């Protein structure tokens, strides 16, 4: 069994962290931004981080614990596919539990495999959030006509209120809906450097009432919503198909989205040509102390 040397993570480890993340994404799928420098820095370098290197110097495992609130700590970790099943995962979990105050309470997983799910469940953690990550190659972009009588408007300072109204009307019925006020919601969009207002759309019906909306960033469908009275009439399909054409015209080689595992829109996206490209998830401990690996 090879020897792994553990050392703290730092800026100099970013290239190797990226290569490790890419290896995990190739094996398990998941959120492609996991390999972006900005996300790796946020996940592994903001708090305390540790990396394990084998006898050749390759980074085979990494983990970190960071604060996500006054007392809330989250852990994340990666193990190279070729180095799994040798106990590295349990070593990382024990290290994270110690840094988190003795008990591992919350884990962020942007590249989730069945083995990861089984491992985390064995630690006494339960999934609290999970999304399908989906990809469209844009080779064949469908066309779905907008329902008759509707008007589509791009994002602007004047239409931002309509977008927010459509967002609330589309999602307010969901359990745990956060319902952010207009100002906070708008800032969350426009402060994202990838946000593409010229490609985003809000749709109004004949009476001028909001019927649905879509917000886009780079080559991602961020949010797609249809108000309840307009569901099942092709508006959601139109918003997605129109967005795919916008991505294609902008030079995107592929389009991405993430959708909750229990969201029926998953079937719509598959009918429009999206394919599943992995899972991302969040895990939390149901019973404090259960599965503690710190001792």
Residue ranges of predicted features:
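A mid-sequence, solvent-exposed acidic-amphipathic segment
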Residues: 171-208
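Active-site/acyl-donor-binding loops of N-acyltransferases
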Residues: 122-142, 241, 252-295
């Amino acid at each position: 069994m090879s020897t792994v040397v553990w050392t703290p993570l730092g800026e100099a480890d970013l290239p190797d962290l990226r290569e490790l993340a890419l290896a995990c994404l190739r094996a398990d799928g998941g959120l492609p931004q996991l390999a972006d420098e900005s996300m790796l820095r946020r996940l592994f370098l903001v708090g305390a981080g540790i990396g394990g290197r084998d006898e050749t110097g390759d980074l085979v495992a990494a983990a970190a614990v960071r604060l996500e609130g006054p007392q809330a700590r989250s852990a994340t970790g990666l193990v190279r596919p070729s180095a799994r099943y040798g106990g590295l995962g349990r070593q990382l979990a024990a290290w994270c539990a110690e840094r988190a105050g003795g008990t591992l309470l919350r884990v962020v997983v942007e590249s989730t495999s069945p083995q990861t799910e089984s491992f985390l469940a064995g630690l006494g953690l339960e999934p609290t959030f999970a999304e399908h990550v989906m990809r469209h190659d844009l080779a064949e972009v469908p066309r779905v006509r907008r329902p008759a009588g509707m008007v589509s408007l791009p994002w602007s300072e004047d239409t931002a209120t309509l977008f927010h109204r459509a967002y609330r009307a589309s999602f307010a019925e969901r359990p745990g809906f956060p319902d952010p006020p207009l100002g906070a919601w708008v800032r969350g969009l426009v402060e994202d450097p990838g946000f593409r207002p010229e490609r985003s759309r809000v749709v109004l019906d004949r009476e001028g009432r909001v019927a649905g909306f879509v917000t886009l960033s780079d080559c991602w469908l961020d949010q797609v919503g249809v108000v309840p009275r307009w569901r099942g009439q092709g508006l959601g399909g139109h918003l997605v198909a129109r967005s795919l054409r916008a991505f294609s015209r902008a030079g995107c080689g592929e389009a991405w989205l993430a959708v909750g595992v229990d969201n029926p829109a998953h079937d719509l996206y598959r009918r429009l040509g999206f394919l599943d490209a992995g899972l991302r998830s969040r895990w939390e401990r149901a019973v404090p102390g259960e599965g503690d690996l710190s001792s």
